[in-house]
Amino acid sequence: MTNLRKTHPLMKIINHAFIDLPAPSNISAWWNFGSLLGICLIIQMLTGLFLAMHYTSDTLTAFSSVAHICRDVNYGWLIRNMHANGASMFFMCLFIHVGRGIYYGSYMYKETWNIGVILLLTVMATAFVGYVLPWGQMSFWGATVITNLLSAIPYIGTTLVEWIWGGFSVDKATLTRFFAFHFILPFIVTALVIVHLLFLHETGSNNPTGLNPDSDKIPFHPYYTIKDTLGFIMMILALLLLTMFSPDMLGDPDNFSPANPLNTPPHIKPEWYFLFAYAILRSIPNKLGGVLALLASILILLIIPLLHTSKQRSLMFRPISQTLFWLLTSDLLILTWIGGQPVEQPFIIIGQIASITYFLIIIAFMPMAGLFENYMLKPKW
């Protein structure tokens, strides 16, 4: 009798995706982050569902409903803090996942890569609307500042902002629709994840060498299921440690105060995972220019496959490009730091230099290094 998992219409799909999937024998721990992102998404959807049972999306009661969840609901404090810090874990895994894709040339699978970029944008949108829901000071002013950026769009900008707000300021209508968006977007993310996996399984996984691994494949189960399980345990442990011991470490103290439209916080800033983009936005003194740079900082990922000049796919054997990659990583850390600082010298000039460097490394230096490394491969005798 043939095994049920190989014949049953539903089990067959799961089997081909997670059990009998041929995987390269040499993929490292950097390949764990895709499955970790899956776990993050599941954790966020489950904790979010339980939070939605007790949350009210009304300006008068939103803040107190979050306080009620933390004080009166059984394990509400745990669910709320896991959801808030789970978002940080999600973005940590996302950034590593994208970084691994750039380092090992996974962007050469263009469909998988492009859907991944769309996924990144969708998750960022989900996190942004979710940040507004507790209706604290930074929630309110963050929503006001970021949505207001759309007013930089010529001609239709102001109308567009008022349409999104549902009025002439961020108010009850805005909060209600943001809750609706925050509820629906994770399901859209889940659908995109399935498409992302569909395209990935068309080509098979890349591997650290960037060479064709077809000659040496192993089944996903048990080798990578056990490897992924170790990743799950480590990530969930890290999340629980953060949640139990310092749940407010990554949050903003201003969010302990209810939203007050009459009182602006001295420094408006988003959560840590948006600070790099926020720093790029602020480094350009023109409003429309800043918005375009903000968009470009993420959308530039879409043109990375077009900028690949090297004869080798991976950076594993390319020391010059490796150096540039780690310079880019350092540059993003500098931008993250600058995004959290007030708009004054020397932070302004540091932010401007870091922003220019970010775009230069991706658009100019990496392709040039690829061409130079090609030249170095040629025998010189």
UniProtKB/Swiss-Prot annotation:
Highest taxon of source: Eukaryota
Claim: Transmembrane helix is one of the keywords in the record: yes
Keywords: Electron transport, Heme, Iron, Membrane, Metal-binding, Mitochondrion, Mitochondrion inner membrane, Respiratory chain, Transmembrane, Transmembrane helix, Transport, Ubiquinone
Keyword Ligase: no
Gene3D superfamilies per UniProt: Cytochrome Bc1 Complex, Chain C
Residue pairs linked by disulfide bridges in the UniProt entry: none
Residues involved in heme b b562 binding: H83, H182
Membrane topology type: Multi-pass membrane protein
GO molecular function: metal ion binding; ubiquinol-cytochrome-c reductase activity
Cofactor(s) this protein cannot do without: heme b
Cellular component terms per the entry's GO annotation: mitochondrial inner membrane; respiratory chain complex III
Pfam families: Cytochrom_B_C, Cytochrome_B
Primary localization: mitochondrion
Cofactor info, note text: Binds 2 heme b groups non-covalently.
Additional observations: Heme 1 (or BL or b562) is low-potential and absorbs at about 562 nm, and heme 2 (or BH or b566) is high-potential and absorbs at about 566 nm.
Task of the protein: Component of the ubiquinol-cytochrome c reductase complex (complex III or cytochrome b-c1 complex) that is part of the mitochondrial respiratory chain. The b-c1 complex mediates electron transfer from ubiquinol to cytochrome c. Contributes to the generation of a proton gradient across the mitochondrial membrane that is then used for ATP synthesis.
Subunit structure, interactors included: The cytochrome bc1 complex contains 11 subunits: 3 respiratory subunits (MT-CYB, CYC1 and UQCRFS1), 2 core proteins (UQCRC1 and UQCRC2) and 6 low-molecular weight proteins (UQCRH/QCR6, UQCRB/QCR7, UQCRQ/QCR8, UQCR10/QCR9, UQCR11/QCR10 and a cleavage product of UQCRFS1). This cytochrome bc1 complex then forms a dimer.
Protein family: Belongs to the cytochrome b family.
Name listed for the protein in its UniProt record: Cytochrome b
Native organism: Macrotis lagotis
UniProt lineage: Eukaryota, Metazoa, Chordata, Craniata, Vertebrata
Gene: MT-CYB
